[in-house]
Amino acid sequence: MIFNYVFSNSFSFLYLMVNVQCRIKEIMYWNICLYWDVFSKLIIYNKVCQFGRIHIFHGKNRHQLLRTCHFTPSKRHSAMSFFEALGAGICAGLAVDLSLFPIDTLKTRLQAKGGFVKNGGFHGVYRGLGSILVGSAPGASLFFTTYENMKSRLSQSGLGLSDPQIHMCSASLGEIAACIVRVPTEVIKQRAQASGGTLSSRNILQTILKSNNVWRDFYAGYGITIAREIPFTLIQFPIWEHLKLKWRIKHSRNKNLAHEAAISGSIAGGIAAALTTPFDVVKTRIMTSQQRLSYVFTIKSIVAHEGFLALYKGIVPRVLWLSGGGAIFLGCYDVILNFMKAEGL
């Protein structure tokens, strides 16, 4: 029910970009109202579990962590828990997209068919930014609210799952939820990036809306995006959580400092980025193509015409982008989440 509601409203965000007569104040007011409507309904359908404090033991069991979990029956506490993940997710998503967008553009142009120069080179590196800003906040917030909620639920499930298994499952479900909003904005962004600076996000959106297969075009590459994001999160989040845990054990603390969360996020993001580059190349080819391509055909075509190493095109900017992105995104999320908990916001 949560996903159905967000799915039905995600294209309202995209439609904003078509209305040329909208002013900035009107857009901001409209977004705030819609965000509140979405989030208030999410709260109704989510009973959030809240982690207790992490206790550090000394002596014989010095390196053993006991995570005491409990359900919080209070609706007020559940809403606070939800809004902590929500607020931190929004800030983290906007921070990483605004700061590292040019690197993402260069990576897309390297991977797109035709090569770097033909697709625009260094010209217009902020093409497609508008679509990402529209989808960034709802996508990131949907991911982290799902991630934190599922961590609590799985810890209380009695299934005997280890921490890495809990992090993997929670992150995977978070990605599936976030991609409902993220994929349409990603399609518009990558087509704008690969246009050589000749098309804006609005132009591409108008073209898609006029096509005979609007839904298919908006969700071109949804399957391969999930196939890329789930392995990425299966690698990134367990590494991130494990490295943060090592910092806490080393310094006998129950929370991480800002630089610890950022460094852990950077390492985890870089490793995951390198290992999942082939998925990203295939996704880029499918999303930037004007024709409907299958995953298998795209992979065979790349290997046959460009060689196996073509599946690793753009690996350097991708690793740089996601290493920096991991530091900003996960570091920012962790710091803001701790701040909101400390201040009771």
From Swiss-Prot:
Q: One short Pfam family name for this protein?
A: Mito_carr
Q: Name the InterPro entries on file.
A: Mitochondrial_sb/sol_carrier, Mt_carrier_dom_sf
Q: Which terms in the GO cellular component ontology are assigned?
A: mitochondrial inner membrane
**PANTHER family, sorted:** S-ADENOSYLMETHIONINE MITOCHONDRIAL CARRIER PROTEIN
* Subcellular location, principal: mitochondrion
| TM helices/strands, residue ranges | 83-103, 128-148, 220-240, 262-282, 296-316, 319-339
The family annotation for this protein states: Belongs to the mitochondrial carrier (TC 2.A.29) family.
Q: What is the annotated localization of this protein?
A: Mitochondrion inner membrane
GO MF, any single term = S-adenosyl-L-methionine transmembrane transporter activity
GO process annotations (BP): mitochondrial S-adenosyl-L-methionine transmembrane transport
Its topology with respect to the membrane?
Answer: Multi-pass membrane protein
| Residue spans of the Solcar repeats | 80-153, 162-246, 256-339
UniProt keywords (A-Z) are: Membrane, Mitochondrion, Mitochondrion inner membrane, Repeat, Transmembrane, Transmembrane helix, Transport
Give the source's domain of life in one word. Eukaryota
Full protein name: Uncharacterized mitochondrial carrier C12B10.09
User: Which organism does this record belong to?
Assistant: Schizosaccharomyces pombe (strain 972 / ATCC 24843)
